């Protein structure tokens, strides 16, 4: 009598033996001469199971170690409309996909909603230890009866709900891969790196949710998210949620003129750099321009002078004294509001901290000291903080209402995250947030500013009407940035493809678990069929799983 094929998990892969009948499963399998068995990538688990079930193939699933969990929230909160829409879109996509929401738009609560509607053992992956502890605190409060653990920062728990850093999850991917039915990738733009992607590739999780404010990557690898998690299923911008889930906000760009001495020195340095670039036939605007400049600068004395000139010119633009005069005036105008100051480098952070007696946070700040500073800021003991990059991602400071960018990179992600630091409403009614972007006029900073705001063309053209030139450190008059109320109408789900579908069917989607008799002929055990059924017609994500008890 032929043996029933068995599916096993083996260090990030699947082994199916003996080979079952049918052909559908062969699209995912590769013969492994070392073990004389067929091996399948773990990420193909769902597709493989669906293919076997479609051909009515009996098999024993010993790969799956995830299981249903009882998630009863301690407090029911009414979600914002965009959270309801995003959850419905994710369900319609088969509970696989990426949701793009601005910072502070409630991505954590959306993940909680996804966990409640898909109550399985769940792995949440985050980029930093600060975020790991924030998620842990949220989940412990949300599900007091659930077992929540940590993986990272010295913790090595294995619990039904596990919060892990990307680094730790990647290191343990071979053993975590079959333990969790749902994986939530927070800040999922971190996933498609050579090191981190194994978290998704070595996992059999049939349900996957990616969360990010800016999933796009400069290396183009964000396209891999379609395979690792699923396609983008929902997107909203900060402007779409202003005054609703997010605080009303306005953005003001202040252009500062260099002093005469700074201008003369800046022009001299830029000329030195440009002469070398012209001689070497290098264009910094080309795809490989910067890399070629770095390589050529190491080969000659003139190249080294050009690189040093470039760096000094950049330092002048980033740290001009005019910016500090503007900063002092902005701090005085907005006192006693909570203010976050962002710079591109630690040297400027420490200069501001020392000259203006403002608490500073950089990557060099000890964790205990960082937590103490942030706690005092939240409690109102500190009104102002200055930081470089460490507050860009994942730090919850809802009390902040003013952000001042003195310098930064051309990254749209960094810009979005810095804006998001002041958009969180918290418990503040009618919060009005404002972002100041202070830019040195007629310097490379103007191009950097244009890139991070998505204005890639005509970066040397005059700035928009909101931008104002301030030669003597005066604070400009602000212009209203309030977005007009959207037209009321039929609720729609907007997909990444631009297509729209009515939520009528999505609102009926529920996930139900039922047991039934298995078709397996194994008389020594009873198989439990764990099914996901919807009240609406089945779509690509309808999925049934079989395990042997």
Residue ranges and their predicted role:
Residues 94-115:
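Walker A/P-loop
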Residues 152-182, 193-198:
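Conserved helix/coil segment N-terminal to the catalytic DExD/H
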Residues 149-151, 156-157, 340, 347-351, ...:
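Conserved helicase ATPase core of P-loop NTP-dependent helicases/translocases
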Residues 393-408, 434-437:
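A short beta-strand element within the Helicase C-terminal
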Residues 288-361, 370:
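Conserved helicase/translocase motor-coupling segment
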Residues 422-449:
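Conserved segment of the helicase C-terminal RecA-like domain
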């Amino acid at each position: 009598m032929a043996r029933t094929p068995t599916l096993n998990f083996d260090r990030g892969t699947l082994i199916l033996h003996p080979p079952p009948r049918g052909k559908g499963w062969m699209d995912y399998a590769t013969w492994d001469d070392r073990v004389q068995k067929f091996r399948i990538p773990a990420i193909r688990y769902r597709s493989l199971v669906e293919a076997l079930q479609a051909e009515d193939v009996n098999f024993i699933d010993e790969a799956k170690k995830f299981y249903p969990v009882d998630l009863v929230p301690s407090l029911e909160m009414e979600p914002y409309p965009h959270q309801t829409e995003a959850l419905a879109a994710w369900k319609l996509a088969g509970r696989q996909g990426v949701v793009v929401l601005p910072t502070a738009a409630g991505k954590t609560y959306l993940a909680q909603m996804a966990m409640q509607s898909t109550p399985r053992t769940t792995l949440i992956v985050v980029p930093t230890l600060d975020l790991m502890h924030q998620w842990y605190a949220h989940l412990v409060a949300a599900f007091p009866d659930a077992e929540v653990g940590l993986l990272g920062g010295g913790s090595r728990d294995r619990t039904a709900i596990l919060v892990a850093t990307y680094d730790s999850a990647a290191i343990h991917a071979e053993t975590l891969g079959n333990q969790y039915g749902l994986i939530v990738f927070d800040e999922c733009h971190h996933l498609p790196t050579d090191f981190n992607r194994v978290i998704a590739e070595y996992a059999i999780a049939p349900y996957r949710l990616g969360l990010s404010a800016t999933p796009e990557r400069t290396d183009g690898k964000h396209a891999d998210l379609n395979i690792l998690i699923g396609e983008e299923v929902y997107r909203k911008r900060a402007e779409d949620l202003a005054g609703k889930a997010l605080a009303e906000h306005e953005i003001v760009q202040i252009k500062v003129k260099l002093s005469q001495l700074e201008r003369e020195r800046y022009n001299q340095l830029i000329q030195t750099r440009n002469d070398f670039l012209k001689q070497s036939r290098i264009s910094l605007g080309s795809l490989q321009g910067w890399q070629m400049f770095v390589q050529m600068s190491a080969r000659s004395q003139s190249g080294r002078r050009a690189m040093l000139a470039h760096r000094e010119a950049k330092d002048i633009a980033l740290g001009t004294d005019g910016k500090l005069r503007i900063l002092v005036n902005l701090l005085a105008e907005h006192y006693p509001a909570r203010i976050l100051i962002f710079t591109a480098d630690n040297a400027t952070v420490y200069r501001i901290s020392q000259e203006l007696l403002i608490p500073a946070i950089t990557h060099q700040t000890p964790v205990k000291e960082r937590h103490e500073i942030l706690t005092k800021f939240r409690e109102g003991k500190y009104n102002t903080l200055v930081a470089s990059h460490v507050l860009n991602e994942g730090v919850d400071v809802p009390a902040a209402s003013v952000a001042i960018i003195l310098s930064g990179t051309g990254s749209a992600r960094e810009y979005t995250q810095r804006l998001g630091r002041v958009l969180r409403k918290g418990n503040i009614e009618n919060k009005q947030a404002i972002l100041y972007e202070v830019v040195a006029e007629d310097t490379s900073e103007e191009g950097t500013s244009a890139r991070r705001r998505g204005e890639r063309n005509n970066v040397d053209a005059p700035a928009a009407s909101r931008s104002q030139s301030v030669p003597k450190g005066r604070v400009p008059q602000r212009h209203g940035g309030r977005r007009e109320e959207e037209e009321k109408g039929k609720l729609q789900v907007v997909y990444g493809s631009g297509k729209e579908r009515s939520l009528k069917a999505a609102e009926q989607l529920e996930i139900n678990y039922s047991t039934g008799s298995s078709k397996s002929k194994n008389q020594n055990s009873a198989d439990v069929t764990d099914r996901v059924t919807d009240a609406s017609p089945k779509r690509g994500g309808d999925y049934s799983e079989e395990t042997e008890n």
